[in-house]
Amino acid sequence: MKIGIYTLGCKVNQYETQAMEQELTASGHELVDFESPADAYIINTCSVTAVSDKKSRQMIRRAKKNSPDAVVAACGCYVQTHEEEAKSLGIDLLMGTNDRARFLDRLEEAVKTRETVADIDDALRRRTFEVLPAGGMANRTRAMLKVEDGCVNFCTYCIIPYARGPVRSLPMDKAAEQVRALRSQGYRELVVTGIEISSYGHDLKDGTTLIDLLEIIAREGGEMRIRLGSLEPRTVTREFCERAKKLPTLCPHFHLSMQSGCDATLKRMNRKYDTARYYESVELLREYFDDPAVTTDLITGFPEETEEEFGETLAFIEKCGFAAMHIFPYSVRPGTKAAAMAQVDMSVREERAARAAAVAERMHQGYLARCVGKTFPVLFEQDRGEGSVGHAPNYMPVTVDVKGLHNTVQNVRITAVDGDGLRGEPEET
């Protein structure tokens, strides 16, 4: 079959799509562009915000429009949390956020019977980590290693615990095995991902933590760079930093989840830290690493957020001096505690997001400017025009005027800020 795939959402979704792609191609199916005619389409959906829900529905409808006779399959968080709504869209195969290994069987069943197949479990009852094969598509330089699934934080705004279930961790021996496989396939960088990787090991009940896993990954990965997914502030302790500093392949890019810079707002969100603890994590990272890229997420206009509270957040993000930020106006998720709170008008949420974005852009440009004159080992991912584009260890994009550097690491001296990235010159080897 010719199959088109579209993925929305986080790196976990990207990883799970990658696993499905491997299974499909290994079984003789052909992957085609999502906009091309196909026998089947797969949409890996997201439900982190209302916009994500809307995009998921749009892509399902687009698939049906692209090839009216094709089988349309959908999986992921939107399907898991909105099963009945998803069924109303006329999807042929509905699977949630589990049993990726059985996806091909279910897809072939839907193609054969032309009847709707629904296979969605109760996420909150899951207790076992689903191990998927390591690897990816041949033209990619960066592989993802999913080490954890699920979340038990139950932030008042978030639906994801209901979509993904409780914490389940990839056993360390399986992680080591997958890292060796990815290394042998020639990947240059490994992204350690999960729904909430700070909780890695929580379910193993043997004292294992994320830093233990990272040491195993570094040992088995050789020269493969290690990049971390989003971290909770509680992870960043002095012990964590002391041990992480000793891992030569760990990229100094730390996405430290924040959401608000106001203690009262954080409490309403049911976040498990205050601004003092958060800032302690930022300072520890800067103590142990040379000008690391500390990045974050921010929700503006959370229920009951006053102008004074938002002002505290603006002052706090200035204090932290982030290298980059992802900023979202608060999105109501039905069924969450925050949905029942007093809502801030959407125009105010968006206006605050714009104000925060202006501060974030100034800080981002300042961080880029500090990179000028430095030399970074850049992993190049693609040609662009007459040059090549890649990322420095701090995840800043770097462009050079040399083609043909795909999947190589080159030392590059940064000569200028280039929009939202950097420009440089490869050093002579």
Residues of each region from the PLM?
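Proteins enriched for Cys/Gly/acidic motifs involved in redox and nucleic-acid/cofactor modification
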Residues: 1-200, 209, 239, 250, ...
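Short, surface-exposed connector motifs at secondary-structure boundaries
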Residues: 2, 67-68, 220-227
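Flexible glycine/acidic-rich beta-alpha junction loops that bind and position SAM and/or redox cofactors
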Residues: 83, 194-203, 235-239, 258-269, ...
